[in-house]
Swiss-Prot record:
Annotated Response regulatory domain residues: 11-128
4-aspartylphosphate modified-residue sites: 62
Domain commentary: Contains a C-terminal catalytic domain, and an N-terminal region which modulates catalytic activity.
Encoding gene per record: cheB1
Catalytic residues (positions): 183, 209, 305
GO aspect biological process, one term: chemotaxis
UniProt region (Disordered), positions on chain: 136-168
NCBIfam families, A to Z: PRK00742.1, PRK12555.1
One Pfam family linked to the record: Response_reg
Organism of this sequence: Cereibacter sphaeroides (strain ATCC 17023 / DSM 158 / JCM 6121 / CCUG 31486 / LMG 2827 / NBRC 12203 / NCIMB 8253 / ATH 2.4.1.) (Rhodobacter sphaeroides)
The protein's role, per its UniProt record: Involved in chemotaxis. Part of a chemotaxis signal transduction system that modulates chemotaxis in response to various stimuli. Catalyzes the demethylation of specific methylglutamate residues introduced into the chemoreceptors (methyl-accepting chemotaxis proteins or MCP) by CheR. Also mediates the irreversible deamidation of specific glutamine residues to glutamic acid.
Cell membrane keyword on record: no
PANTHER family: PROTEIN-GLUTAMATE METHYLESTERASE/PROTEIN-GLUTAMINE GLUTAMINASE (PTHR42872), PROTEIN-GLUTAMATE METHYLESTERASE_PROTEIN-GLUTAMINE GLUTAMINASE (PTHR42872:SF6)
Name the record gives this protein: Protein-glutamate methylesterase/protein-glutamine glutaminase 1
Length: 369
């Protein structure tokens, strides 16, 4: 009889100065049969001692540590042992600059510590943390997407919770608008795309899965690097050429048509595809409000957020592009969008900015004829 060895568990090193947080993370990590806690330690020095005998597959790191702060520890890890790191921090406000710095130093993901108020929120937070850990290992293994999660989560809500579906309707010619969705690996990928755009770029609206309180710092950092203006979304903010609007963390972002132009709506509401903001919500609003005036772009990320409603965009006449597998950190969301029939073209990351500009020129030429 042939026997098969069980797949090796992903070993996680938890580094957090709070005993309560370490205990919480230990329970969360061990709720996933594919993950195991290698050690849970209170500071960077204890983490270094643990790593002398065994290297973890992923480090779950808080930024606020005694002795050596989390950013210094992260910098040393990347210099000595480039192990995937997921930063899980309660930082908001001014501390989010440190979270942006963590990404620039090489952290694979930055997520918020859970502040769950009920069983459903605790379950959703647990799933997001385990997903981030699993996705971090995938960035090293370069597989197309992690295996389906063995947990049994509650029902995954669709965009219907925020914006009801409706059959495609004719939409008048307006200015062009680009809608982008990204998740794991998206912060670096978005920087590559946006910094390659000239100030004359068409209007851009973005959902990047991020924690609450983090997107303002992310937008400021991008704005300092780009020829275009990059802003965190505010309700009724005008969508205009040379401007990219990034969804607030923990709030949905919708596109709204106003005469020949667009504004954005910022909404609370249920998690959609286990995310808030959700790419599906943005893409559905683009299908309904912009139709053939829109370009949808789905980029690196784990899961299927955006896949269903990118197909709605395409059915409504929009052009659609997925980032190719080779240039994705995690080829999850683009793969699912292709599987749902929503993708017109597949392009590498370094071609996306050019494709955005080509779309803007084609649309302008079409409308002036």
């Amino acid at each position: 009889m042939t026997t098969h060895a069980a797949a090796p568990s992903t070993r996680v090193l938890i580094v957090d100065d709070s005993a309560a947080a370490r205990a919480m993370f230990k329970v969360i990590v061990e709720s996933d049969p594919a993950l195991q806690v290698m050690a849970a330690v209170p500071d960077a020095f204890a983490a270094a001692r643990a790593m002398r005998t065994e290297l973890p597959d992923v480090i779950l790191l808080d930024l606020e540590l005694p002795g050596m702060d989390g950013l210094t520890f992260l910098r040393k890890i990347m210099q000595q042992h480039p192990i995937p790191v997921v930063v899980c921090s309660s930082h908001v406000g001014a501390g989010t600059e440190a979270m942006v710095s963590a990404l620039e130093l090489g952290a694979r993901e930055v997520i918020s510590k859970p502040a769950a108020r009920n069983d459903l929120e605790r379950q959703e937070a647990s799933i997001r943390i385990c997903d981030a850990i699993r996705a971090a290992t995938e960035t090293t293994r370069r597989r197309s997407q992690p295996e389906p999660r063995p947990l049994a989560p509650g029902p995954k809500l669709t965009a219907d919770e925020i914006l009801p579906a409706r059959p495609p309707r004719p939409v008048p010619e307006t200015m062009p608008v680009v809608c982008i969705g990204a998740s794991t690996g998206g912060t670096e990928a978005l920087r590559d795309v946006l910094t390659a755009l000239p100030a004359s770029a068409p209007p851009i609206v973005i959902v990047q899965h991020m924690p609450r309180g983090f997107t303002a710092a992310f937008a400021r950092r991008l704005d300092s690097l780009c020829a275009i203006e990059v802003l965190e979304a505010e309700d009724e903010m005008q969508v205009m050429p040379g401007r990219a609007i990034i969804a607030q963390g923990d709030r949905h972002l919708l596109l709204r048509r106003r005469n020949q132009g667009y504004r954005v709506s910022v909404l609370d509401g249920a998690y959609v595809c286990r995310h808030r903001p959700s790419v599906d919500v943005l893409f559905r609003s683009a299908a309904q409000e912009a139709g053939g005036n829109a370009l949808g772009v789905i980029m690196t990320g784990m899961g299927d957020d955006g896949a269903r409603c990118m197909a709605e965009m395409r059915a409504a006449g929009a052009e659609t592009i997925a980032q190719n597998e080779e240039s994705c950190v995690v080829y999850g969301m683009p793969r699912e969008a292709v599987a749902h029939g929503g993708v017109g073209k597949v392009e590498p990351l370094d071609r996306l900015a050019a494709r955005i500009m080509e779309f803007g020129r084609r649309h302008t030429e079409r409308t002036v004829r």
